[in-house]
Amino acid sequence: MVDPLCNYNVLEAIFSYLELSDLSRCSQVCKSWYHFLNDENSDVWRWHCLRKLPKESIKSDLLASVTTYKTKLRAYLHAWNPNDCSRNVYIKPNGFTLHRNPVAQSTDAARAKIGFRQGRHAWEVIWEGPLGTVAVIGISTKEAALQCHGYVALLGSDDQSWGWNLVENHLLHNGDMQGNYPLLNNAPKYQVGERIRVILDCDDNTLSFEKNYEFLGVAFRGLPAKKLYPTVSAVYGNTEVSMVYLGTPLDG
């Protein structure tokens, strides 16, 4: 009779060296493999996490909302794209934080590595430096511009992007102000370091936000059936913005 522990160790060794795409297929082979890979804190996911993520990120407070090795790895794979941002932006070694260089008369944006056209998705945005005169968070398609002259609300300036300007509490799309947000009397302004949760519902075609675990309401409706990417645009020199993908939002 084969020792179950032996089987476990063999599977662990094999799965630790497979590509992530192969692990997804392996989980569909049988119930045993599915349950094995469903343990998000197993040594398999720990190994892949250690192999992919910068060491400084794994135990960082930045990832406090993603508590397992698998969710940390998923967040990293969904983080800012160093190849899809303004030339005045670079992604820091932790992989989750963008830094805007102090370039005068420029507005600069960055998109995430992965966009969505199906399902429900949530991510956190943390502005870790001064906002400046304009600081916008939201979504865009691949067609939206990532750099322009001057200090403007770049995200939301065309029909390919939708944003919330944290400085003035305005919603922006197609170059127009779509209204105040949130719809509260004397709505408090964003404070540097606060975590804002962005919720994209591709099934209902809506974009919403939460702050301090309070749902702020639906910001945009009627979003197009296109792949939409987490995006921010910034104007302040040396400001930094982090983004952590959370997965499917929990209702309530």
Swiss-Prot record:
GO cellular component: cell cortex; neuromuscular junction; nucleus; pole plasm; SCF ubiquitin ligase complex
Residues of the F-box domain: 1-48
Pathway: Protein modification; protein ubiquitination
Annotated keywords: Neurogenesis, Synapse, Ubl conjugation pathway
One Gene Ontology biological process: positive regulation of protein catabolic process
Domain B30.2/SPRY residues, every copy: 58-250
Pfam families: F-box-like, SPRY
Compartment(s): Synapse
Recorded superkingdom: Eukaryota
Family to which this protein belongs: Belongs to the FBXO45/Fsn family.
Function description: Required in the presynaptic motoneuron to down-regulate the levels of wnd and restrain synaptic terminal growth at the neuromuscular junction (NMJ).
SUBUNIT field: Component of an E3 ubiquitin ligase complex composed of hiw and Fsn.
Name of the protein this chain belongs to: F-box/SPRY domain-containing protein 1
Designated gene of the protein: Fsn
